[in-house]
């Protein structure tokens, strides 16, 4: 299994969370770009190139891209702080479009299952995500079942390449809503 740097894992996590409901919302793009820009982990980093590389891979690989992400996450050795950072990127991305779909909760539960941090520590930082942590994944077979259910209902469209826009365009987008 190929290893991945933590910054790439964070970006891939946020990207997969953004696409997990079958829709890429501009607010999610802006949030991910902002999170990457605010993090010291992303240096010498061209967001537009990196995010569009992920779009292209998702478009060509489809569900295999998501499966590969889960495998990368499963085999990553992360510190507790890195796990909290990954959860932060995931939760904030899921909430960015102000619509939390059940597919996104299922997706997060699969992510959560691959982390070692306790629910108590997660809830201490994110007390409002209890529904994301409810224990319905109780065995490997159930995890496999919920993962398969996620993939069975997932319809990934061909996503457009992402073009960044300036703050003025973002303000206009917010006013149009």
Give the role of each language-model region.
Residues 1-177:
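Small-residue-enriched hydrophobic alpha-helices in membranes
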